[in-house]
A protein has these predicted regions:
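C-terminal regulatory/interaction module of P-loop NTP-utilizing enzymes
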Residues: 4-67, 72-124, 129-231
Length: 231
């Protein structure tokens, strides 16, 4: 795959925040300076448990926008695209039955959130996008390019951030083709114990865990191969 910028979680957060700030910037007339179709989704590549979701939530909080997180491995073709149903249409005086799709669960959730909170802008964070099933992979690629699931587009004011695990942590990882990398702004996050420790203190990770990791620093980086892939 295409290599991005390698950085620790703190630097990654800054990078994401700067990009998000640019994407949310409006001109004097209240239009986004960078239109939705020009915004390349960020793709955060980093090991599980490094705090990807947490930094997205922090960035959203600091920018005063909403955030909606999904792990794409929990989604099926139906929940991403919407469910098919039969609609009746009239063409030239004759009635026909055609398939329509209900709204994508993910897109519907954005509208629900805007309705419930009154927040009009937000970050849609889709994790584990490189571990999706074969049937979801083409849908995901189309989404990354056009920001649509089925017939429904991500509403204006919502910015897409994606993340994935490196192949050594998950044997169901798909390699994106080079075309896909051109659509994404890739950020590679490296485990960095000292930065993680500072971050962990702030977020309240138990002191015993920190002490243990301080003594056994190797455990912080170690990946043990288990039967069903890497943990």
């Amino acid at each position: 795959g295409r290599k991005g910028y390698r950085m620790n979680i703190k630097q990654a957060k800054e990078q994401i925040k700067n990009t998000m700030t640019a994407y949310f910037t409006k001109d004097a007339r209240g239009n986004y300076v960078m239109p939705l179709y020009k915004q390349r989704p960020i793709f955060l590549m980093g090991p599980p448990g490094i705090g990807k979701t947490a930094i997205i939530e922090q960035v959203a909080g600091e920018l005063g926008v909403g955030v909606l997180s999904y792990s794409m491995t929990h989604h099926t073709r139906q929940s991403a695209l919407g469910l098919p149903y039969i609609a009746h249409k009239n063409y030239g005086g004759k009635e026909y039955m055609v398939s329509e799709y209900t709204m994508s669960e993910i897109i519907a959730a954005i509208y629900d959130m805007m309705e419930e909170t009154g927040v009009k802008e937000g970050i849609l964070f889709l994790d584990e996008i490189n571990c999706v099933s074969e049937t979801l992979a083409p849908i995901m690629l189309q989404f990354l390019q056009y920001k649509v699931f089925g017939r429904h587009r991500v509403p204006d004011g919502w910015v897409v951030v994606t993340a994935g695990n490196p192949p050594e942590y998950n044997n169901s990882v798909r390699e994106f083709d080079i075309v896909t990398w051109d659509r994404l702004k890739r950020v590679d996050v490296e485990p960095d114990f000292d930065v993680w420790k500072e971050y962990a203190y702030k977020t309240g990770v138990h002191a015993a865990v920190l002490t243990y990791l301080e003594i056994r620093k190797a455990d912080f980086y170690e990946i043990e191969s288990t039967i069903d892939g890497k943990r």
